[in-house]
């Protein structure tokens, strides 16, 4: 005859406590997971980096809209180029903790008191972003106050200060350091100084844009401040 095994009172209490502990732990994990807040993102008004990316995105969207409204033989290629750049900008927004897809034109979203002067890029097709001109304190900066040229940008140079009040951003275009402009013809040499980090670079204008000066990626890297995609305090000089 088999003997039925029974649990004593102490063992029953121990098992009950264990079961309650396991159940409570599972409930805590589920509650913690469900209550976890999503990661916060920054807007253009909260971050200079986000402002630069939002401005570049807005400029490309405007360029596409203008090309669609007034197409020519090269519009399709230009639009395809800009759409690819927009996707790259969105990836940078995500990586930088910015609101993905946020768009701003002429830096007006975060700087309402600064009147915009710049226009969108036109023609060429190979340029991919937009440097926006906005009124600001840098308009009063004398040309001679600009620091010496950095090692990456060539020999130090000084010349006629131009594009007063301009902010500078990157185009998203690759290649050797270069600039585009709506005021200076190809071959003109411009020196761009970032007053926030005392870095300068001298580049040659190679194409047309809708802004006084627009730096491609390589040129912008020579003067950029870490983590930022917009130079608010810039001095631009015509040196050749």
Swiss-Prot record:
Gene3D superfamilies assigned to the protein according to its UniProt record, in alphabetical order: RlpA-like domain (2.40.40.10)
Annotated segments matching region Disordered: 93-160
Entries under InterPro entries matching the protein: RlpA-like_sf
Highest taxon in the source lineage: Bacteria
Biased composition (Low complexity): 110-119, 129-150
Protein's UniProt name: Uncharacterized 23.9 kDa protein in glnII region
Organism: Streptomyces viridochromogenes
Higher taxonomy: Bacteria, Bacillati, Actinomycetota, Actinomycetes, Kitasatosporales
């Amino acid at each position: 005859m088999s003997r039925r095994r029974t649990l004593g009172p102490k063992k029953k209490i121990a098992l009950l406590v264990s079961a309650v502990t396991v159940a409570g732990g599972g409930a805590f994990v589920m509650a913690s997971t469900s209550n976890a807040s999503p990661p916060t993102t920054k807007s253009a008004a909260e971050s200079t980096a986000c402002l630069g990316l939002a401005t570049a995105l807005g400029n490309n969207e405007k360029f596409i809209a203008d090309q669609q409204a007034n197409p020519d033989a090269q519009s399709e290629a230009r639009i395809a180029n800009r759409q690819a750049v927009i996707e790259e900008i969105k990836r940078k927004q995500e990586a930088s903790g910015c609101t993905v897809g946020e768009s701003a034109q002429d830096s007006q979203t975060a700087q309402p008191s600064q009147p915009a002067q710049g226009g969108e890029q036109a023609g060429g097709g190979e340029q991919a972003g937009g440097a926006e001109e906005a009124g600001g304190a840098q308009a009063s900066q004398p040309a001679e106050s600009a620091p010496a040229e950095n090692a990456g940008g060539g020999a130090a140079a000084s010349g006629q200060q131009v594009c007063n009040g301009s902010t500078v951003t990157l185009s998203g275009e690759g290649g050797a350091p270069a600039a585009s402009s709506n005021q200076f013809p190809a071959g003109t040499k411009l020196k761009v100084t970032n007053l926030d980090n005392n870095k300068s670079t001298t580049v040659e204008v190679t194409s047309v844009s809708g802004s006084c000066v627009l730096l491609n990626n390589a040129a912008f890297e020579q003067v950029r401040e870490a983590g930022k995609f917009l130079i608010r305090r810039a001095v631009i000089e015509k040196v050749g």
